[in-house]
């Protein structure tokens, strides 16, 4: 048809390279993306959000990149759903996939992010997630589901 594929799934490269964690995505950003600092911070923000809501469906196929006129950049986030799982699909650092915001903060340098910036990103995510219960009521989420996730969200806040 003459159209070209202008998107890239992390799973494409990781299947070939045998990758298994967020730091593999960091490597791709460092090697291939425009706006490296912006993309690294956005990835870090997404990892923090995934941890806070218990999104354990964070495998490589749920991370992608778009080819823009300036180069590769993270695609908009997608398929982010809360769960009661305490572990991520991907490793947060070199050795742990435990959904622990402290582990992420301690690993900020592996994401090429200064501690002050990492703390600020985490504060922003925590503030965004803190209002989840009011939003759930507004969206008419069944009370039993709100109750089910209450402890999960408290665990990470």
Residue spans of the language-model regions?
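Anionic ligand-binding catalytic core segments
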Residues: 1-157
């Amino acid at each position: 048809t003459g159209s070209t594929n202008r998107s890239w799934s992390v799973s494409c490269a990781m299947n070939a390279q045998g990758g298994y964690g967020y730091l593999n995505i960091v490597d791709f950003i460092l090697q291939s993306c425009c706006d490296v600092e912006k993309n690294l911070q956005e990835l870090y923000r997404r990892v923090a959000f995934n941890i806070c809501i218990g999104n354990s469906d964070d495998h490589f196929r749920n991370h992608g990149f778009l080819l823009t006129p300036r180069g590769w950049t993270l695609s908009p986030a997608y398929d982010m759903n809360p769960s009661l799982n305490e572990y991520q699909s991907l490793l947060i650092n070199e050795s742990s996939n435990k959904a622990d915001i402290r582990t992420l903060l301690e690993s900020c340098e592996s994401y090429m992010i200064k501690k002050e910036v990492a703390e600020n990103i985490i504060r922003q995510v925590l503030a965004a997630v803190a209002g989840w219960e009011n939003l759930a009521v507004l969206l008419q989420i069944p009370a039993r589901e709100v109750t089910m996730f209450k402890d999960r969200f408290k665990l990470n806040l």
